[in-house]
């Protein structure tokens, strides 16, 4: 089962805005840029550099795993755009370790989504 089209992020203007955004999540194996959007659902894009992973098979495996984790953990997020950039070494992690990294990212995104106290 693939991620729904409404969760795909493809607009270059949004990519540029995400990269300029001050809201970031850094991990050893990935960087995530995020910001609120006007759509009522979360949207995500995964970027994997050819210089870090030469084989398309590896890049596709990473992309499938990341999308599976996002579908599982981002289900209760609202109105946020996320750009995930994968770094070297991500492929060597176990699936459970990858889930832990994305769980931390999801908690950070829920803080963004939560109403601010007055």
From Swiss-Prot:
User: Could you say which EC number(s) this protein's record lists?
Assistant: 3.1.26.5
Task: Give GO MF terms, alphabetically.
Answer: 3'-tRNA processing endoribonuclease activity; ribonuclease P activity; tRNA binding
Bilayer-spanning residue ranges: none
Lineage top rank: taxon: Bacteria
Q: Which Pfam families match?
A: Ribonuclease_P
Q: Which reaction does it catalyse?
A: Endonucleolytic cleavage of RNA, removing 5'-extranucleotides from tRNA precursor
What family name appears in the similarity comment?
Belongs to the RnpA family.
Provide the protein name: Ribonuclease P protein component
Q: Which organism is it from?
A: Mycoplasma pneumoniae (strain ATCC 29342 / M129 / Subtype 1)
Organism lineage string: Bacteria, Bacillati, Mycoplasmatota, Mycoplasmoidales, Mycoplasmoidaceae
Gene encoding the protein: rnpA
């Amino acid at each position: 089962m693939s991620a729904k089209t409404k969760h795909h992020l493809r607009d270059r203007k949004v990519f540029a805005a995400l990269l300029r955004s001050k809201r970031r999540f850094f991990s050893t194996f990935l960087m995530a840029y995020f910001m609120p959007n006007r759509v009522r659902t979360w949207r995500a894009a995964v970027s994997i550099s050819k210089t870090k992973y030469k084989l398309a098979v590896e890049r596709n495996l990473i992309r499938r795993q990341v999308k599976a984790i996002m579908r599982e953990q981002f289900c209760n997020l609202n109105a946020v755009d996320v750009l995930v950039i994968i770094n070297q070494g991500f492929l060597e992690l176990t699936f459970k370790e990858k889930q832990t990294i994305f769980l931390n990212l999801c908690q950070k995104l829920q803080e963004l989504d939560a109403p601010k106290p007055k």
